[in-house]
């Protein structure tokens, strides 16, 4: 079995359906004795350029280990799902389980207060 990294972008109007989509795609991989090494839901983000007149989309990253049949079935599911705007599959040399740079950035943002937030309590105390 080979290792793959898959990123797919979902139409923002279908964001509520993303957990169900993830479950369906996970079941496709696991039904053929594949494994999911990393699954990250990056949420709604700005696109670099509009796709179908949409400027934001919901991003999901999956690192999987599966055979060619499971990958073909997964890509077939992406192609025939109108909510999936784009998908990209990259063959990897080994399984990747560490958090992606996008998740590390998100975590560091949540741990450090924003620059604009530091000045607000002082202004409120003066008033």
Curated annotation (Swiss-Prot):
Signal peptide: none annotated. CDD domains: bS6. GO terms for molecular function: small ribosomal subunit rRNA binding; structural constituent of ribosome. One of its GO terms (biological process) is translation. Keywords: Ribonucleoprotein, Ribosomal protein, RNA-binding, rRNA-binding. InterPro entries: Ribosomal_bS6, Ribosomal_bS6_sf, Ribosomal_S6_plastid/chlpt, Transl_elong_EF1B/ribsomal_bS6. Residues 117-127 have a biased composition (Basic and acidic residues). GO terms for cellular component: cytosolic small ribosomal subunit. Pfam families: Ribosomal_S6 (PF01250). Residues 96-127 are annotated as: Disordered. Binds together with bS18 to 16S ribosomal RNA. Belongs to the bacterial ribosomal protein bS6 family. PANTHER family: MITOCHONDRIAL 28S RIBOSOMAL PROTEIN S6, SMALL RIBOSOMAL SUBUNIT PROTEIN BS6M. This is Small ribosomal subunit protein bS6.
